[in-house]
Amino acid sequence: MVVPKNHLYDPDVQLIKSRLSKLPASMLAKLNAKHIKIKLIDGPITSLPEFAYLKGQVPRGWEKTNKTWDDVPGIGGSETVAIRIGYSDYGKGHGSVNLELHETAHSLDSIVYMRISQTESFKKIWKSECLNLFGENQYFTNYPEEYFAEAFAMYYLNDTTKSELKKKAPLTYTFFQNLQ
């Protein structure tokens, strides 16, 4: 994990580290083996050289928000996961239950598990449970990779979100229970 020197002891940074440390050791080892870096930043994600090309661009699913990647507090899916410090919680510039878990899940999905969200077996689960879990939220009902990332975040965030996942999407819950 890469943390700005002026934020090493920031309580928000400590909470991010704590939440990510709840992931199974085998999963953390796979992130490390694939050289996936989690960068905590104190400015826009587009300030990082690897994401500068996104400046002024509108993210998929954000077309009606008047927001660009400059406003989005996190990104995952590549060898770099970028998380803006202080934006972890729902409603802080995003609609996820937890930013760092959601964005890390994208890199796990695309790199570690070789796009597991696009497999027929996962898509079958997604199609059968996405409406029950997320209602008509098109971000999760249209994109299996977003469903994967958000359900992953629910599984690992806390007992309340994990219980909600188990109740509303038992197949998804079992999928993550078995994912190492």
What do these predicted ranges mean?
Residues 1-19, 29-180:
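Active-site-flanking segments in enzyme catalytic domains
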